[in-house]
Amino acid sequence: MRIAIDMQGAQTLSAKRGVGRFTVNIAKALARVAEEDEIILVLNGAFEASVRSLRDDFHGILPQENIKVWQLHFDTKAIDPANRNLIKAAEYLREEFINQIDADIILVPNLQEGWLDSAVTSIGRLPTKSKVCSILYDLAPLIYKEELLNNIIGNWYYEKLDLTKRSDAIFTVSWSTKRDISELLHIPKENIFVLYCAIDRNQFKPITIPDGESYQLLSKYSIKQGFLMYAGGADKNKNLPRLIEAFSLLSPSLRKDHQLVFVGGCLSEETNLRDLAMKCNLEYNDLIFTGHVSDQDLPALYNLCSAFILPSFHEGFGIPPLEAMACGAAVIASNAASLPEVIDCPDALFDPYDITAIAGKIRRVISDEQFRSDLQQYGLKRSQAKEFTWENSARTALEVFKTIVPERISAANGKEEQTVGLDKLLQAIPSIGAQFNDEELFKIALSIGESFRPRNCEKLYIDVSSIAVQDHATGIQRVTRAIALQLLADQEITCNLVYSTPTIESFYLADNVEARLNNTIIAKADRNDQLVEFYDGDILLFLDLHPALAITHASYLQKLRNRGVRVFYVVYDLLPVHFPQYFVPLLRTEFIEWLDVVFQSDGAFCISKTVAEDLSRYCRENAINPSTNFRIDWFHLSADFMSSAPSLGFLPDAKHVLSLLSSRPTFLMVGTIEPRKRHAQTLAAFEQIWAKGIDANFCIAGRQGWLMEDFIEKLRAHPERGRHLFWLNGISDEYLEKVYDASTCLIVPSEDEGFGLPLVEAARHKLSIIARDIPVFREVASGHAFYFNGLEPEALSSAIQDWMKLREEGRAPSSEGIPSLTWKESAAQLKQILFRPHDCVKV
């Protein structure tokens, strides 16, 4: 079976109450026990924060693709009568979205949502072949309608009850509530099924709390002595006024040693309850109102209380007593509704309408040590009963599902019906009869457009924002062009290039870039390019490095992730982190902010295992809390730029320069001239070599970078320039290939790199390599390079001369063993980790 679960009960204000906990826990249990069945969670995109938290909560339980989000961009709060027609439009939208899932079962854990927010629930607005099951927790508002319902909310509540009657099966949480539903709603008992609530036994259990910690916790809530604890809301059915009156009947000596502590959502009624307490001659400190407490504090309070009490005259189930018993608390409760079947101990119960009886039970549990101990031991045993497990309830639900689901309709027929259903949705909204204004029509259209994706067209979008605006032909942009070209040519995936700017939130198709990439002519961004519509299942890959764009788009990218779009970044290095002295402060700050954005994505793909391990270490050392789904992976680059979008052309003196390079041993440095690449050290080393009369060339192929003005001035004015010293500034890939062919040895003295493309380029041209001994160069070149250490010119000068001796003796390491990928192979590695994670680095 395919089971779709509407998770709105875990997204609204109900999330912090029993409904929310039930929704999440039954969904998790179904996912655990449904071995041959598929569980799909359906979320309302109007609740953005909850979408992210629920995706995180179900990480490792369900695949992310099993979490579907429909979008709602207009107000549907039922408390506002003006929203009535918008609510109907949203109901059509939600039902058709769920119909598209093609589920056998649609489980709605709470139909009574949407009064104060944009939750939307309905049954039967559109035809469906799915069976719809709902959960009704209690009928307290109906049973006590004079106290709990007013005319405004009453009509809405009755509409929701009518929806419940349309369910193919109704679940509830106790046999008591089942009787109420059958008798009051006139529903056959055979259509109503009991799913007991359960608790997290890893959270609610007896614990030993050191005196210091217990004192600190109790002081936090102004609890100064033993205390009688209540947990829950302040609804009328909770019977809190009678509890206060009963507490006031205790002797002063008992009250002196015990406070009455209200834990949870009672703050709204605190003033009224304190007024009552004053009339009952209670002191201010006799009553404590904690408000909502953390998931850590609640079990601790259960463990520390003298006793727990639930005086309700009506409960659908009664989770707090079960939690308290599991923590070893002595529990006393009302003998009304579901509580006798939950607690199952007549001696612990009292008449909720009899204040004297309530006071008597409180007095006994506080003063009778044996009675209290018996209740504690009994409660521990009762809370462990098999029926109070989520797995048991989930298996019960599955059995019910199997009895009401007919033979599965073929997938082909299902898809055909879905297409018709979407047409019906588009026809149904105008037929509501509302005169929607232009803004409302736009928001309805936007909601439909973002909720329903074209089928079978998951796409890979590659961000090329930097080269779409201006291609500086940096190493990263060379990689971007080469990888993008290969992925565009891959027939197994649908790939598009996209761009944006820091001032525009949306992304646009980079049509001009894509169209001209094969000719290596990168067009400037065309503002008439088509706006990208992202859908569930799409991937957005930031292949280019554009920190400002990622930072300004952080919020928008989280919205995309909420909708099921996966966002990944390629990380080339962490140089600004490790060598801040070589970067302007603003750039380093921006890079750190960019890393923060990266860690909130779905993953980082590094261009070497060294960088991947470095990124993981950075995350740990800086106590960064990445997104739940975040993973670090790595792939290797190619260096064959001539086979993939190379830049072309020669400078006028190229022939002469190449002749000079070929005339004597030439040592080549390739890359942008930056401080950490150690050009200054290398030039000083060659000045020592030339001073010894050694006839050798030093050639630099690379553009001027930042913080190198003094070096560039020296380079331009150097007496050996044009004789033994050459600077080839911004030459094409085609020209660089010829320079490699004319050179003897590659020198790579950089203090750090993300990969080291020149190493692989040199190997392709069978050039020997002298490289600094750093981890990434060992990863790329292994034993196929001559390594050196030291930051002084003498260290490199000595290494060059040692290598020259080895070369004369025929013992210099050969670079020919360095693995060399094609760009197609490099792109294939990236594609594999995009779609099939393998050797992930642990964070």
Label each region the model flagged.
Residues M1-V843:
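Carbohydrate transferase catalytic cores enriched for Leloir-type hexosyltransferases
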